């Protein structure tokens, strides 16, 4: 049972299966992803804020978008600022270009939040081409409020940087603020993951929202047919199921509250998380992962994030979380007996 991934716990929308079956496998997919991008525009636009198709870039998962960003913005010995610990592919994509990477570490002894004022000083003095922040963050679940992102955007504007906000887990924030307001600013890009929102991990699908100029620059470097036909059709179908994310969110909130309470009852430290995963401070993450794996449960050892005392647990259906809680109780009891 895989708790190491963090995707919607209720499976893909039912209509996705029919959409996939309708795809002609002998035909090339639309290289422009027009139907999908139009569906994204309909989904995110409101009467007061219309998003044009020219401001939407579809990608083979959001990870492709980060690799496009680094190729375009960091190719000439550029600099990137990463707010860490965070998703490792940001660093990986930057390193492929030979860029200088600046890291602003969160307070790992406290609430896992970043010193945003320190971040703005780095941006204004170092003038990095890219500033990347995951919001809510992976693996800590920290969610920056509107004012904090605003400070970063203000600094990016002064420095001539592009602020990239990865919102892969935004759909599972209980009370989010409207980040689409940021699209009024040319120095900001939002990146979202349909893979996680709609449990379509095998298909790989994400999208970015930015100014027409930024989207056009990235599109020049994106291979044709990057997003396959199955993913395009599945994405259109998923967005049409307007009640899906409400059902997924309710499932996440219920199971997350249960699991957090159960693990705290075991004496484990479980920091507040605004995402569809939680951290648990277990002492020796590698050991706990191994012991849980022996019981058929897979969790994420956070050593690679620089957090060797923590495991990350993705939220699955409540029944699965009940089984994990029981398994972790057995591991905790065995640890006390040693």
Give residue ranges: language-model regions:
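Short beta-strand
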Residues: 2, 191, 269-273, 302-303
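PLP-dependent enzyme catalytic core of the Aspartate aminotransferase-like
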Residues: 294-295, 304-338
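Short, conserved charged micro-motifs
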Residues: 14-15, 284-291, 320-323
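Conserved core of the PLP fold type I
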Residues: 25-157, 169-185, 189
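Conserved PLP-binding catalytic core of the aspartate aminotransferase-like
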Residues: 253, 261-295, 311
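N-terminal "arm"/small-domain region of PLP-dependent enzymes with the aminotransferase-like
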Residues: 1-31, 39, 127
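PLP-dependent aminotransferase class I/II
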Residues: 13, 187-264, 268-271
